[in-house]
């Protein structure tokens, strides 16, 4: 799965710091347009609906609650010809790409080569059950009847400029 953050300019290093602070296993890549694609990798098959719920919680905690979440569909009907939506993958035209992973090496942020990206995938792959129980915005059972983005906002606080919208959503 992935999050697509279209914010320009975007400080990829701060984004990585926040994800590490939240202990979210993922890889941040620069997108074609300079935003970020945050990729999540799993050791086993994962239900798309479950992924989307947790990804919404993570995106809210990052302050990007309106970013796109991939997969966009919770299910597709193959017999009807559905194929789902796509996201541009990193390392297109890998010799001179603008779409690369950003990793921390020896305390510094670096543009990862394709082989380093593949190595990083092995490090961040997680089990779906571990991903779903990440305590992003506090205890997993906090306010279970609220939508994920509101649970996160109520647990970690409302970002500047979001007070009125959050109050209206409540």
Protein language model regions, located:
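Short, surface-exposed amphipathic charged segments that create phosphate/polyanion-binding patches used
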Residues: 85-87, 103-106
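A structural signal for short, well-ordered beta-strand segments and their strand-loop junctions
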Residues: 27-31, 39-41, 88
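Short beta-strand
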Residues: 26-33, 68-72
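Modules that initiate DNA replication and primer synthesis
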Residues: 5-8, 17-20, 34-51, 56, ...
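N-terminal catalytic cores of peptidoglycan-degrading enzymes
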Residues: 1-3
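Flexible helix-coil linker/hinge segments at domain or subdomain boundaries
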Residues: 59-98, 117-129
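Short, well-ordered loop/turn elements at secondary-structure boundaries
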Residues: 21-23, 32-35, 82-84
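A broadly used, surface-exposed interaction patch
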Residues: 9-26, 66
